[in-house]
Amino acid sequence: MAKQKIRIRLKAYEHRILDQSADKIVETAKRTGATISGPIPLPTERTLYTVLRSPHKYKDSREQFEMRTHKRLIDIVNPTPKTVDALMKLDLPSGVDIEIKL
């Protein structure tokens, strides 16, 4: 019989919310008897935007804005049906993007 694995990938702009969500997922999975690997911090994606400060000219005067996307990876090995039900009922903050692969 092949091992089942659920891979959960979390993304957020704020690392505090991301870590809280990862802790909730890990705690829920451990409470229902599944084996956990993670949360593994993945590289932070950094997007840089450069814009002119003035509306028309003065190209030498520019302002830079950055957007950081923090990521975490959690693997749940051999999940039980209780684990899947508990994860479906879990309430996470709206600022966290969740990607689940079976």
From Swiss-Prot:
Keyword Methyltransferase assigned: no
GO biological processes: translation
Entry keyword annotation includes Ribosomal protein: yes
GO molecular function, one term: tRNA binding
UniProt keyword terms in alphabetical order: Ribonucleoprotein, Ribosomal protein
A UniProt-annotated Pfam family: Ribosomal_S10
One Gene Ontology cellular component: ribonucleoprotein complex
Similarity remark: Belongs to the universal ribosomal protein uS10 family.
Protein task: Involved in the binding of tRNA to the ribosomes.
Protein name: Small ribosomal subunit protein uS10
Species for this entry: Lacticaseibacillus paracasei (strain ATCC 334 / BCRC 17002 / CCUG 31169 / CIP 107868 / KCTC 3260 / NRRL B-441)
Gene: rpsJ
